[in-house]
Amino acid sequence: MTVEGRVVLITGAAGGIGKVLCKMFTELGDRVAGIDIVDPSKVQDAALALQADVSKADQIETAIEKVIQTLGPIDVLINNAGLADDTPFEQLSHESWDHDVSLVLRGNYLTQRYVIPHMAKQGKGGSIVNIGSVNGHIYLGSPAYSAAKAGLENLTKALAVRYGPLGIRVNVCAPGTIWSPAWDERFKKHPDVGDRMKRWYPVGRLGTPEDVARAVIFLADSKNSFITGTTLYVDGGLLAGNPCLIQDIYSENNNFVF
């Protein structure tokens, strides 16, 4: 793994995946700047912690300028901020729709809008990893979140093509279900939901923040300079096929072992 003492900017840095991203990039020897909407004290393992709402242009522009002034030019941007409202579509308020789309899609647009010119100016390229989701490919609830994640994939492709000649790579890491603190309340209310969800994954388990972080580190590595405009799925085989359906289809076949 290439370690260059890079400046790595991570949004959503106080969440389950964000905390692990900060920790693992710091362990690589990188200087990490963590941005989150919550109090900066919640951001751990970062050389610089800032509070900002990524969907607010003035806040994110100010935060990015602070990162550059304090740590230097940004080499790696990881857009990890996001939130999903699982309200059924017919009950979803306009405000909730706007909030999810603004946070996931507009937030990613804004961070890249302000970081890419700096990357281009420094003349040595850079790597951007947008945290997508399998929700951007199949419907698993959260319609606004799903629509925004699908849009993020096309934005990623557009930016990869536009800025590839400048050595700026843009990719998506799309996780499946990741067992993080965000799921704690749901698991408390429905203790069996975790086991039921595992049945949908060919590998027989849910993902961890570490699974996602390792994939992001791979995409961010400058050694992988021929990888851009693509999506790396960290989904335990979820999009490859449905083991529950297969099991039902072949349930009467004694020769089928699953």
From Swiss-Prot:
PANTHER family: DEHYDROGENASES, SHORT CHAIN, ESTRADIOL 17-BETA-DEHYDROGENASE 8-RELATED. GO terms for biological process: lipoate biosynthetic process. CDD domains: SDR_c. It is found in: Cytoplasm; Nucleus. NADP(+) binds at residues 17, 53, 80, 113, 145, 149, 178, 180. Its EC number is 1.-.-.-. It comes from Schizosaccharomyces pombe (strain 972 / ATCC 24843) (Fission yeast). It comes from the Eukaryota. Keywords: Cytoplasm, NADP, Nucleus, Oxidoreductase. It holds the Pfam family adh_short_C2. One of its GO terms (cellular component) is nucleus. Belongs to the short-chain dehydrogenases/reductases (SDR) family. SUPFAM superfamilies: NAD(P)-binding Rossmann-fold domains. Its main location: cytoplasm. One of its GO terms (molecular function) is 3-oxoacyl-[acyl-carrier-protein] reductase (NADPH) activity. The active site is at residues 145, 149. This is Uncharacterized oxidoreductase C922.06. The keyword NADP applies. The keyword Zinc-finger does not apply.
